[in-house]
């Protein structure tokens, strides 16, 4: 059967406001039941088309509406993608993500995107793309080319969303996720903390994700990177313990999903990252850049993994979590484990 909509504001708030260590213990217990506690999946993200986006997302350096000093770049050639993917594979990356600053791709761009997917797949890497909104036709084309994952974040709660973005409706994002899922592509969808939202908004974001007909296989949790020139350049920092609580909550609510520590990680100290791993993070972006923002250095990450005795997952191990049979019934099989409170 499909995952039931068991999460509501009452039971989720009760869980969120548990004593910190009780919440962490519960998240770690669920994490260990579903994943190896000392292994982490590594992804990297390449911007294949940079800047001049018509959207007005108030946090984004790529919006054409804000003067951020970003140098725009047209859709790059496939040779650049292949070279970047080869370097990523050598560094231990198992998933190669490609992002384009579009509201939505045009049909004329699809053939080149298909070639990018096929070329990266030939290297033995998983593929992910984030291109904006997709219609059914485009989603099916990308699926047929072999795309494994599609990223389309909800960003925040439905109620707070209109204060962040006006050029795309919340329902448009849900529709794209449905199109991706219907096409047979696995879903990557999460949000951003630090937009000025409340605890209630953060909780509602996770409720929305967890109560989808099938929760995302991958859930990136971002901490706002304040970009000069955007309306959010002076937003307040997110408290580290508040951030970790959301990680733990995401792990409990979506026990079979990859929880990815994404943007903002370069500003976190080792102790905060370690607590995020303990709370349920089992995936990170690896490399010096996330689209247009800086990321934690590979050397720094390697040192942290060594201190924590954590190992990067190898490509040969990916079938354990990502074979098609398992993904097709991720939340429906008898081993599915969840705990509301």
Swiss-Prot record:
GO annotation, biological process: biotin biosynthetic process
Residues reported to bind [2Fe-2S] cluster: 97, 128, 188, 260
Gene3D superfamilies reported for this sequence: Aldolase class I
Annotated [4Fe-4S] cluster binding sites: 53, 57, 60
Pathway entry: Cofactor biosynthesis; biotin biosynthesis; biotin from 7,8-diaminononanoate: step 2/2
Cofactor(s) essential for the protein: [4Fe-4S] cluster; [2Fe-2S] cluster
One Pfam family in the UniProt entry: BATS
SUPFAM superfamilies assigned: Radical SAM enzymes (SSF102114)
Keyword Transcription: no
Function per UniProt: Catalyzes the conversion of dethiobiotin (DTB) to biotin by the insertion of a sulfur atom into dethiobiotin via a radical-based mechanism.
NCBIfam families linked to this entry: bioB
Protein name: Biotin synthase
Lineage, highest ranks first: Bacteria, Pseudomonadati, Pseudomonadota, Gammaproteobacteria, Enterobacterales
Gene, per the UniProt record: bioB
